[in-house]
Amino acid sequence: MLNRRAFLASMTGAAAVTRLAAAPRRPNIVLILADDMGFSDIGCYGSEISTPNLDRLAQRGLRFTQFYNTARCCPTRASILTGLYPHQAGVGHMIQDRGVPSYQGYLNDRCVTIAEVLRTAGYRTLMSGKWHVGEDRPHWPTDRGFEKYFGLISGASNYWRLDEGRKMAMDDKPWTPPPQGFYMTDAITDYAVKFIDQYGRGPEPFFLYAAYTAPHWPLHAHPQDIQKYEGKYMKGWDELRKERHRRQIEMGIVDKRWPLTPRDERAPAWETVEDRKARDRAMAVYAAQVDRLDQDIGRVLAKIREIGAEENTLVIFLADNGGCAEEINRGVKGVPPGPPDSYFSYGLPWANASNTPFRLYKHWVHEGGIATPFIAYCPSIVKERGKIVHEVGHIVDLMATCVDLAGAKYPQTFNGKPIQPMEGKSLVPVFQGRSLGSRKLFWEHEGNRAVRDGKWKLVSRYPKEWELYDLEADRTEMNDLSAKMPERVAQMAKDYAAWAARCGVKTPEELGKKTKQKG
């Protein structure tokens, strides 16, 4: 029997022989993923951080206001790559095997990746960045459809050097960063640009997945980038949230009817904070990470223009989850955030600002954990420049979108194994000004659970009871209607239970004692 890689090679060859000259040529697809970045952290979503390249994409393309991820790094990556809910792909939690198929910690053989599907359709398949859906062979990117790979197989790591126990790879071989001159965001970009230069000039279209680690902790950034922001956050998180919310309303990203959520009760009022200078430094380094991410995305876009591919390259940008409230401080004592010997996160109060106007964070499935910026730009596909889209989208839609644009066929079987049907819808109609219609979407992570059905959202913060919100009137989830509408709660809870059973969702109690994972 052919193994997965041999099967792909044979199918790719067949596709090359039988492929007809397309007019117009099928689009290149560049999918850019940020890590642990909040809803309001880039300029075109209300931020003060300088992100001119992403802002320009939004001005010339479209922005979604209601696009969702799965609240955590590994599950989001599994869903993006497969078009399935993470449990269906085997990554219901993180990369640890929890003893049941839906939580095995790596992509299973009942799913296919975008790379596997597009490669059989004649695309060159390229990846640079964070994988985090399979630590060991044969579960690396080159085992799952990518011809070329550079990046971090594992989760978060020091930006300046590889943390002990973390893995990087070049194609199918381990790779170690040089002792000097390495910075993770820049390195991911270097290889993304190199791959476009090498494979973007040929007759075949290409798919590039650029999965950055920025701005995930630890807070590491170039001194010149930090310098731009140090001192700018002495105004504090309370004022920052108000300013971002005001800009979001002016932009049309947020409805003025939706109140800004109160400051998280665990975050102190800024005027009571004693270590303000240290807090300012932390947010300045975080902003510098976002700034550098945008600079490097600019390098990717410049290379696309250089090879003459801008007109027919779809560029998509989004984040894997909301801002992260985890408190991390394990670097060398006395070293501030930024250099290699530091190891900090920016903490809950700044994460609360990152997720403006929503509440809660990465891990949770309230809007603060799952709402992401989403930008799509392609002159030949996205016709309405600067449009703000209020359609509901989800990362499961990315597989269907890529299959649609590539003229590919999503398989019922692959390498002799039955493949689960896609869960998402193609976003191409939205790119062309049409509607996707009403839909039901589901979430579960660490016992936190949610259902969205049209304007209604049923959500629970584990181990609490269900809450019900009308997101059309109350996107910031301030007015719980569950007590007033028990019938709707019961019906949506029934829908959730059916989905959970179908997808192999387990409660924390069923999985046993939870193990902390770096993500």
List each model region and its residues.
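Formylglycine-dependent sulfatase
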Residues: 2-462, 466, 473-494, 498-501, ...
